[in-house]
């Protein structure tokens, strides 16, 4: 091997190694060893006053990673003529940003300018799951914060009306597999959905059916009572499953029973491969948790274009 080829090989090995090592659970071991603990405390405190916080943080993290990668861009406020992601239509109902603000404030007091807002959100999402009775995991850290946040880009988020082909494409564009899709959909075990997210299944479903025939009839009737065709009740909707504050596999059990809310949930039963995974997770909470952790680490490692550590998560430096 000549010297030129050897040097090229060294460069390639270095670049690949750098990418692999870019995120690490030990990233703050020496610069801010208490980072995880500080974020956990902020989430715990918020949860003691508001049981909707875990679902909010988990959803916030998903929405961050699916637009520009996991760079904390969903946390930025709109400014001037720029309408930020958090004010895009799919994100209007996002809340609990104050939890990230509180964690950031505490971290800045202990480790000024060290921990990124993107990492704080990733840690908070992990804590949201763990503190709701779900699994915990070592979060790879080292993300940088992005400087761009545009509401129009929230169109890239998977919609609750997506079919399985649209979901496959949407997740695939982010390097996520169908296994990841089914596992991450289990995050719907936490939280609440507004009527607008599933009205399409209850009223004028298609030219032949008024209501989606895959819905359990009694379940559909209950939803119609909450979400009539001309609903005027602000924030009307339904819990995502029967144990809204517990992270478990009830979501999959309800899905099999025809009691899911979103068309995108029901679409997981449309093809044999994903239907098999739904059944697997419905039958074993342990299998679900194992798959969820693996897919969460994968999703939260989607690289963004961030290059700074914000001092305030709502605005760039």
From Swiss-Prot:
Q: Which cofactor does it need?
A: heme b; Ca(2+)
Which Gene Ontology biological process is one annotated for this entry? hydrogen peroxide catabolic process
Looking at the UniProt record, the site noted as Transition state stabilizer sits at 59
Residues forming the catalytic site: 63 (proton acceptor)
Q: What does this protein do?
A: Removal of H(2)O(2), oxidation of toxic reductants, biosynthesis and degradation of lignin, suberization, auxin catabolism, response to environmental stresses such as wounding, pathogen attack and oxidative stress. These functions might be dependent on each isozyme/isoform in each plant tissue.
The record's subcellular locations are: Secreted
Glycan attachment sites: 163
Q: Which residues bind Ca(2+) 1?
A: 64, 67, 69, 71, 73
Reactions catalysed: 2 a phenolic donor + H2O2 = 2 a phenolic radical donor + 2 H2O
GO CC, any one term = plant-type cell wall
Tell me a Gene Ontology molecular-function term this record carries. Answer: lactoperoxidase activity
Q: Output the PANTHER family linked to this UniProt entry.
A: PEROXIDASE 25-RELATED
What induces or represses expression of this protein, per its UniProt record?
Pathogen and elicitor-induced. Up-regulated transiently by a cold treatment.
Instruction: Name any one Pfam family assigned in the record.
Output: peroxidase
Q: What is its EC number?
A: 1.11.1.7
Ordered alphabetically, the record's keywords are: Calcium, Disulfide bond, Glycoprotein, Heme, Hydrogen peroxide, Iron, Metal-binding, Oxidoreductase, Peroxidase, Secreted, Signal
Q: Which domain of life is it from?
A: Eukaryota
Protein name, per record = Peroxidase 64
Q: In which tissues is it expressed?
A: Expressed in the whole plant, but preferentially in roots.
Chief location bin: secreted
């Amino acid at each position: 091997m000549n010297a030129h080829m050897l040097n090229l090989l060294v460069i390639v090995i270095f670049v690949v190694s750098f990418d692999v090592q870019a995120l690490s659970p030990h990233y703050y071991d020496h610069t801010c060893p208490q980072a995880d603990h500080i974020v956990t405390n902020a989430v715990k405190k918020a949860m003691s006053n508001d049981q909707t916080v875990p679902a909010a943080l988990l959803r916030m993290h998903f929405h961050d990673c699916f637009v520009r990668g996991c760079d904390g861009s969903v946390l930025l406020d709109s400014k001037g003529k720029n309408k930020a992601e958090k004010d895009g239509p799919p994100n209007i109902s996002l809340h609990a940003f104050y939890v990230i603000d509180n964690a950031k404030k505490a971290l800045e007091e202990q480790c000024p300018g060290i921990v990124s807002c993107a990492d704080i959100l990733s840690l908070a999402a992990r804590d949201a799951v763990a503190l709701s009775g779900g699994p915990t995991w070592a979060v790879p850290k080292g993300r940088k914060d992005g400087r761009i946040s545009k509401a129009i880009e929230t169109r890239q988020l998977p919609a609750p009306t997506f079919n399985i082909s649209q979901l496959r494409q949407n997740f695939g564009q982010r390097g996520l597999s169908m296994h990841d899709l089914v596992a991450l959909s289990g995050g719907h075990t936490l939280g609440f959905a507004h009527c607008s997210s599933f009205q399409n299944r209850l009223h004028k479903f298609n030219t032949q059916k008024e209501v989606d025939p895959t819905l359990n009839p009694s379940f559909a009737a209950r939803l119609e009572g909450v979400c009539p065709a001309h609903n005027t009740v602000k924030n009307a909707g339904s819990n995502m499953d029967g144990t809204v504050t517990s992270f478990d596999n009830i979501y999959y059990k309800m899905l099999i029973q025809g009691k899911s809310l979103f068309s995108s949930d029901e679409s997981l039963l449309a093809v044999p491969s994903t239907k098999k995974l739904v059944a697997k997770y419905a039958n074993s909470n342990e299998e679900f948790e194992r798959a969820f952790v693996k897919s969460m680490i994968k999703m939260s490692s989607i690289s963004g274009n961030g290059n700074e550590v914000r001092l305030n998560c709502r605005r760039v430096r």
